[in-house]
Amino acid sequence: MAIIYSGTNDGYAVAANANWVTLKNTTTASAASASTGFSNTAIQGSKRTLRGGSIVYVIFRSFFEFDTSAITATPTAATLNISGRSNNSGDFFVIASNQGATLGTGDYDAMVLTGTPASYDGSGTGSIESHVTK
């Protein structure tokens, strides 16, 4: 099996809001970064208490761009290796996206989905396979 590494347009987009429901429905990030530098946050959903006691919710979404143009046959299998840790249980999903030539704040909601999953169970093994457009 050929090994394909992600490219130089990898990065993240982050959004924050005082309201969790509003944040989940956000379509544009407040900041984005595409660089060959290092970021220790691949995905994150968190609730933070700010100085003064106000609450802010934050979502980081990471983007990894793979050049698959050299693949000439239809793949029968693929493996994506991701390492990480969680402070508690939670689901994360790998979803196709249509990010721009340069990753930007507008790519935050560039996911290729059909419909929305009804719920996530927090086990870390959830599936949204039926909602992913391939």
Predicted regions and their residues:
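A short beta-strand element within beta-rich, extracytoplasmic domains
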Residues: 66, 74-86
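Extracellular/periplasmic catalytic domains that process cell-envelope and extracellular macromolecules
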Residues: 57-59, 72-74, 86-88
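Beta-strand-rich interaction/scaffold domains
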Residues: 86-134
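Generic detector of low-complexity/intrinsically disordered segments
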Residues: 5, 25, 52, 82, ...
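Flexible, small-residue-rich N-terminal segments that precede or flank a structured functional core
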Residues: 1-68, 100
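A ubiquitous, low-specificity "background" feature that marks scattered single residues
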Residues: 31, 46, 73, 113-115
